[in-house]
Amino acid sequence: MQKVLYKNLGLIDYKKAWELQERFSNESVQIKIGNRKSPEASQKETVSRLLFCEHPNVFTLGKSGSFDNLLLDEEGLKTVDATFYKINRGGDITYHGPGQIVGYPILDLDKFFTDIHKYLRFLEEMVIRTLSEFGIESGRYSGYTGVWLDVENPLKARKICAMGVRCSRWITMHGFALNANTDLSYFKNIIPCGIDDKQVTSIEKELGQKVDLNKVKKSLKKHFCELFEAELVDA
C-alpha cells in the first residue's frame, strides 16, 4: 500500500496552488532523473501527494483549448471579479470558485500503474462512488472525460465534475473539479470544456440544498484510497 501525503489547502489563489503543484511535481521529476543518472547510488524516494482546495473565481484554459471559449474580455473578467490563466493541463476551459472541491493528485504513477487512461478512469470512479453516497447516480459520458448525470439521455446529460491532468515522467499534476455548492452562473461566461450543447450541474442543484463539503471530501478520500490502494497521511 502506497503512502500519499494529504493536505487541505482551503481557499487558495489559483496561481499560488499552481506554483505549489509545479514545485512538488518538479521535485519528484528531478529525483527520478537523478536516480536514473546514478543507478548504482542509493535511490531517493519520490513523494506522492493529494491536495484539496477551493479557489476564488477563476477561469483556466488547458493547452488544447481555444480562447474563443472564454466569453469575457479583460473588463468583463473584472466585472465578475474573476481571473484567467492559460495553463499546462489537458482539456479546454473550465471555471473554479468557492463551493467547488478541487483535487490535485501529484502521484508518481511508477508506484501505482503507468497508464494515464486508467488513472483518469480511477479519478472518475472515485467521484462516481462519492456521488452515489449522496444519492446521486452518475457515470461517464461517451467521448468525454469527467463525471456526468443522465448519461443515457443526450438531451439531459450534464457535467458535475471536470477533469484535466498533466503527466511528466509519470508524475501527475492538476486533477478534478467537483461542483458541490458552486455558483453555476459563472459557467455562463464560458463554453465549458469547449462543449456548447451540454449543461453543468452541482450536488447542491441536484439535491436542492447545500452539502457539507467536509463530508464530500471524506468520501472522496475514502474512495481514493480504495481505488489506488493508498494510505493517506496528513501532511
Which residue stretches match the model-derived regions?
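N-terminal lobe of the biotin/lipoate ligase/transferase fold
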Residues: M1-A157, C167, V211
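Conserved phosphate/anionic-ligand binding catalytic regions in large, soluble enzymes, centered on
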Residues: T94, S168-T182
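Proline-centered turn/helix-capping motifs that create local helix->coil transitions or kinks
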Residues: S138-G139, D183-S185
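C-terminal accessory segment of soluble enzyme catalytic cores
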Residues: W148, L184-A235
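Histidine/acidic-rich helix-loop-helix segments that form or flank divalent-metal centers
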Residues: I160-M163
